[in-house]
């Protein structure tokens, strides 16, 4: 019984294990990445699709029409990200994170007021660009730059935010 406890203690609390050493000393930055990953959900397909029935009913759209508008918004946001992604080379992580968080909040607020097809396309564009695009880009770039030897482990920990979001969001 005692040897099992000592194994558990040495495995989880020892700083000799590189994975747990990373968590112990870098928990703040990893939490940042995990939360950014979680909050990117507001622009992810799994989250937006939860409301597609109500959106289609409100705007009298077929599945195909909604899918076409969604594809247009996604494609245009991806093209915009090619240009906007350069900001991660010139802006600080803190500044870009704050701007991205504010843009996700404003995009969500705008999306809640959608009353026409044009507003829908623009709202989807904003959500896809700020949430799915920039939010993911900002945290993954920051984590990739910060860690050399533990890059994969750090990205895996931060990526758990998406899994957490899929499990807990409506």
Regions found by a protein language model. Give the residues of each.
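Intracellular juxtamembrane helix-capping segments at the cytosolic ends
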Residues: 133-147
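Primarily marks hydrophobic transmembrane alpha-helices of the MFS/SLC 12-helix fold
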Residues: 94-97
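Pair of pore-lining "gating" transmembrane helices in MFS-fold secondary transporters
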Residues: 24-47, 126
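Hydrophobic core of transmembrane alpha-helices in multi-pass small-molecule transporters
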Residues: 38, 118-134
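Residue-level signature of mid-helix packing/kink "hotspots" within the transmembrane helices
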Residues: 74-82, 167
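Helix-to-loop junctions at the C-terminal end of transmembrane segments
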Residues: 80-92
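C-terminal ends and interior cores of transmembrane alpha-helices
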Residues: 102-115
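Glycine-rich segments within core transmembrane alpha-helices of 12-TM secondary carriers
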Residues: 150-170
